[in-house]
Amino acid sequence: MYYCISFTHKNTDIALREKLSFSNEAKKSEFLKIISTHENIEECLVISTCNRVEIVAFVKMACAEFIVKSLALLCDVDKDILLEKADIFEDSGAIHHLFSVASSLDSLVVGETQIAGQLKDAFAFAVKNNFCGVHLSRAVHSAFKCAAKVRNETQISKNPISVASVAVAKAKELADLAQKKAVVIGAGEMGELAAKHLIAAGAKVIILNRDLQKAKDLCERLGVLSEYDSLENLKKYLNQYEFFFSATNAPNAIITNSLIEELPYKRYFFDIAVPRDIDINENENISVFAVDDLENVVQKNLALREQEARMAYGIIGRETSEFFRYLNDLALMPIIKAIRLQAKEYADKQLEIALKKGYLKKSDKEEARKLIHQVFKAFLHTPTVNLKHLQGKMQSDTVINAMRYVFDLQNNLEGLNQYKCEFDMENNDEIY
């Protein structure tokens, strides 16, 4: 069954999410290797962003305690706290949740489109490292299709919003950004988003980054309203400008009290990184906004999008039902094929016995074979038609299991692999 354990802005604070975050691929790979050794876990992947950690798996039976214990040991967190906080989804609930995540209905900012790329990256990593097979591939591919339908049939992603844009929106409430200079620390995806929104608001941006070439490349994409410098000069900029947006992947805070000088004007720091980049004291001239502090702005956007979200959830519900109908169809067709193949094998076997015992002349073999095959085809016609009529119906699972038992069919039916997942496992760059 499909299985999902979820830690998000809805059930954890930023301090806990910092500890759970997978800031590098080595940590993610280590965790997936650990949990994939469990006898009940067949496939798994991890989605890790500033607002969520999602463990998505295909399992034989529920194993939340093992997964959470493994996560707790790796991240040095109390297992009982994680079990208390975790949202756990099974089967249709897990698929509905995955589709909601992919469609940005579960995001801090509903309608933001970053999550699709983050899911794509998580999936590609799992496929590349052999943690993900046909079951999760089908689920993720269907999640992308659902997300596309939500975008195309609702207005929820029009004028897309991200945590970075919410931070800039908050800055615009505090001051007119036109002609001001804002410092963006970090040249990654979140830093680039913040810079784009700042430029759209009329500000000029300064990009600070450890890798100067990456900062230069970003400025070339941004255009004339940007410049760049090394992160080594951070202190100089911190004590020269008013607005700072920090979005690095540093494991610890990079902006601390030791770098801050007292100045006679207000400065605003927006920490949009997880783990947090900023650890300074606030006072009348220094204000710090972390991811969780942006909730008020987020709520305004949620109110505007409430109707679109209701429509989107309707789509997700229908797509979830359609996904399980699709799985039932995949299961039924191999059953039909296996029963017919079994009948053919028994008929051929009995024909050979009849020939050996002299019940039939060898010259009559082919005519007898045709007759026998016509008989079993006629006999199986009505069961085959009735099985096909079950496709997409609730009772199909019960019938499938009964047919497997009655005809002694193996769990991995011959022919199942012909139902190729739409995701090409050999070309995992063609995911989305």
From Swiss-Prot:
It catalyses: (S)-4-amino-5-oxopentanoate + tRNA(Glu) + NADP(+) = L-glutamyl-tRNA(Glu) + NADPH + H(+). The record marks 97 as: Important for activity. GO terms for molecular function: glutamyl-tRNA reductase activity; NADP binding. Substrate binds at residues 49-52, 107, 112-114, 118. NADP(+) binds at residues 186-191. Gene3D superfamilies: Glutamyl-tRNA reductase, N-terminal domain, NAD(P)-binding Rossmann-like Domain. The keyword tRNA processing does not apply. The keyword Ubl conjugation does not apply. Homodimer. During catalysis, the active site Cys acts as a nucleophile attacking the alpha-carbonyl group of tRNA-bound glutamate with the formation of a thioester intermediate between enzyme and glutamate, and the concomitant release of tRNA(Glu). The thioester intermediate is finally reduced by direct hydride transfer from NADPH, to form the product GSA. This is Glutamyl-tRNA reductase.
